[in-house]
Regions:
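N-terminal phosphate-binding loop and adjacent alpha-helix
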Residues: 32-63, 262
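Short glycine/proline-rich turn/loop motifs
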Residues: 239-247
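Phosphate/pyrophosphate-binding loops at sites that engage ATP/ADP/AMP, CoA/4′-phosphopantetheine
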Residues: 53-69, 109-110, 265-274
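Conserved beta-ketoacyl condensing-enzyme motif
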Residues: 65-91
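Phosphate/ATP-binding catalytic cores across multiple sugar-kinase/actin-like superfamilies
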Residues: 253-278
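Flexible beta->alpha loop and helix N-cap segments adjacent to enzyme active/binding sites
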Residues: 7-36, 41-45, 66, 84, ...
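Extreme N-terminal starter segment of soluble prokaryotic enzymes
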Residues: 1-4
Length: 539
């Protein structure tokens, strides 16, 4: 079957194509529109469809829209209770009205599409399928926690032989994701966008409000939880300027309480299912600190997290769910590089049209290693783009990890807060000697690891204030060019580690196409652009 998956209702609109149980393509609309998160997460944007991402997915698969067997839409408007506690009836009615007309909006966006083949898939089921069906093992327990779907904020269950068996759900208004979003907004950041900044800030605080939050956020013993309304100003004033210690302490408290609740839920789920493996999705699964506590202290032997755990991943999950429901065997997700890519000839054409001076060295990996060893900042544009929020060696900014000032340099390039860390990529075969306390390999930057004390002074740019790092391990069999660059850098410096952060500037989505890469290179203090086999140097 040829199945297109669509996410469109809240934020991070995306499309994915699954053919005969195999993931062919997946992309977020923001990479095409250049609008961060694709659109605003408000009810009157629910009609907008990821039409450019969808058209590209079909093109990548060589499929005409009339050849599709089904379209999975990751939201079921029939399940929404407009009068549920905590929801605004007028806003919910508007959102569900738009969502219910999605087949016709898609027909307009993709001429030739039969609206009768569009199927509504529950939001949390789509999240669950994106991880439980895409994981490298067939059976697992599954946990999905986010802000909200139609009428719930959490689903727990298990996959057995490709079928989802639900064990527990949590109805609104109780929501771990919305709790974290509320905190994000109180701390002066953008909700449904900047929650990762709160996670970083938490490392600078201590959870001194924990007794109060144990009462406000608690499990119920049956696989659910309660989140009571929080008077945030009672703990720290709403941030409108600089940060105070109370802001960091509040972030640390909520982060700790989130982790504790997830651990309790995981232990309950293990007892219910007997599964030894856990798969995670939903926006909360992008909290790599919480994931790491689940790995260290939780009851599961192995944890796999969907790299696109946010709402964009529900496009993939909706398509996989329909494929599994049709009885098709599902192949594990081949990796996160599911987006657009260009041939060498196409890249040369872009460079020629841009009128920039470029060269084709014998080995771009060696050239980049030389530049990094000389403490240059490199923009790295290679292969197909990543699906999800993490830069995983396809659209990256790279730097030398041995110079602490590079953290500030990169944060300045990207317009980021200085308290935020940058991440290391490391050769998979060398990871265990440098990083501990987390799962290895760790190819998707979804866990934090402790930096061995012998290495903290050697790689200060990637060592966070709490002595951890969110690593990406690089396997030469899966990413030969990236591994070759890392080995060349290690030969020159003795460090099998390179700083890796996403290739973008402040407020912009990650670079996707060659035009984006050239624009980013030209508008930021980056020394070298490695684009396919070509190199562009700063004049």
């Amino acid at each position: 079957m040829r199945i297109l998956g669509i996410n469109a209702v809240f934020h991070d609109p995306a499309a994915a194509l699954v053919v005969d149980g195999r993931v062919v393509a997946a992309a977020e609309e923001e990479r095409f529109s250049r609008r961060k998160h694709g659109k605003r997460p408000v009810p009157f944007s629910a009609w907008e469809q990821p039409e450019r991402a969808a058209r590209w997915c079909l093109e990548q698969g060589g499929i005409d829209v009339t050849d599709l067997d089904a379209v999975g839409y990751s939201y079921d408007p029939s399940l929404v209770d407009h009068n549920a506690e905590g929801l605004d009836p007028a806003w919910e009615e508007l959102r569900t009205t738009y969502a219910s007309r999605a087949p016709y909006f898609l027909e307009s966006a993709l001429p030739g599409l039969d609206p009768d083949i569009v199927h509504f898939v529950r939001h949390h089921v789509a999240h669950a399928a994106s991880t439980g069906l895409a994981a490298p093992f067939r059976d697992s327990a599954v946990m999905v926690a986010d802000g909200r779907g139609e009428n719930i904020s959490y689903l727990a269950g298990e996959y057995r032989d490709g079928k989802l068996l639900e064990c527990a759900t949590q109805s609104l208004p109780h929501s771990l994701g919305l709790l974290y979003e509320d905190l994000t907004e109180h701390l002066g950041f953008a909700r449904s966008s900047d929650e990762y900044k709160v996670m970083a800030l938490a490392s600078y605080g201590r959870p001194r409000f924990e007794p109060e939050f144990r009462e406000l956020v608690r499990t119920t013993g049956d696989g659910g939880f309660r989140t009571d309304p929080v008077d945030w100003a009672a703990f720290a004033p709403r941030r409108t300027g600089g940060f105070g210690q109370e802001h960091a302490d509040l972030a640390a408290t909520v982060q700790k309480r989130l982790e504790d609740v997830l651990l309790e839920l995981a232990r309950w789920l293990r007892e219910q299912t007997g599964q030894s493996r856990l798969t995670l999705a939903g926006g909360t699964a992008l909290n790599c600190v919480a994931n790491s506590r689940l790995h260290r202290e939780g009851p599961f032997e192995e944890i796999w997290v969907q790299p696109a755990s946010g709402d964009s991943g529900t496009a993939l999950g909706a398509a996989l769910h329909l494929a599994a429901e049709a009885g098709e065997p599902i192949e594990p997700m081949p990796g996160a590089d599911l987006g657009r890519g260009w041939t060498d000839d196409e890249l040369r054409g872009w460079l020629d049209r841009a009128g920039v001076r470029y060269e084709r060295p014998d080995d771009v990996a060696d050239t980049v290693a030389d530049a990094l060893a000389d403490n240059r900042i490199v923009a790295w544009f290679q292969g197909r783009a990543e699906f999800g929020p993490r830069a995983l060696g396809h659209r990256s900014l790279l730097a030398h990890p041995g110079h602490k000032a590079n953290l500030e340099r990169l944060n300045d390039v990207k317009g980021r807060e200085q308290f935020r860390p940058v991440a290391p990529m490391v050769l998979a075969e060398r990871a265990a000697e440098i990083f501990g306390g987390g799962p290895l390999p760790s190819p998707y930057m979804l866990f934090v690891h402790d930096v061995d004390p012998k290495w903290t002074d050697r790689i200060p740019a990637v060592t966070h204030v709490d002595g951890t790092a969110r690593i990406q391990t690089v396997d030469a069999a899966e990413k030969p060019l990236l591994a070759r660059m890392l080995r060349a850098f290690a030969d020159r410096t003795g460090l099998p580690v390179v700083v890796n952060t996403s290739l973008n500037t402040a407020g912009r989505p990650m670079v996707d196409d060659p035009r984006d890469a050239l624009e980013c290179f030209g508008s930021s203090p980056v020394d070298l652009l490695a684009i396919g086999p070509f190199v562009v140097r700063r004049p």
